[in-house]
Amino acid sequence: MRILCDTNIILDVLLDRAPFVEASAEVLKRCEIGIIEGFTTTSCITDIFYLVHKQLHDNERSYQAIEQLLTILRVADVTNSHIAEALSHRASDFEDCLAAVCAKSIHCDFVVTRDIKGFVGFDIPILTPSELIERMEL
């Protein structure tokens, strides 16, 4: 199974955001041990660094968070054609639209996010972390 992890899932774990951290951590754990092939986008990486640094006020811990993340998830490149396709959708949430376009281009089965409404209208299934775990346990 191939998934694209949205920014909020990763931040739940890195910033220990209750009550979401448990399910999000389980998704990343399954990626880490190879049960799931997990991806994020290049733009997500820069957003995560910025938001972790803003919260922790610690450059070194922010760099370490990204280094650790890169041992768990693969990074899907954002290309000119992805951006052009996302722009053509005229979606209200461009960031989520771009993530959906990238996920489709690398043949992900799902986008995993807590921001379901940001991904409405795209031709890729969307699951919350809890829904993904539940689906895998059936």
Report the location of each language-model feature.
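Short, well-structured N-terminal submotif of metal-dependent ribonuclease cores
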Residues: 1-40, 54-61, 121, 130-138
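A short acidic, helix-capping loop that chelates divalent metal ions and anchors anionic groups
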Residues: 12-14, 47-48, 84-86
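Active-site-proximal, substrate-binding regions of enzyme catalytic domains
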Residues: 25, 47-74, 79-81
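Short, conserved alpha-helical segments within structured domains
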Residues: 40-44, 82
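Short acidic-hydrophobic, aromatic-tinged amphipathic segments that line or gate anion-handling sites
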Residues: 76-78, 126-129
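Short loop/helix-cap segments at secondary-structure boundaries that form the rim of catalytic
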Residues: 117-124
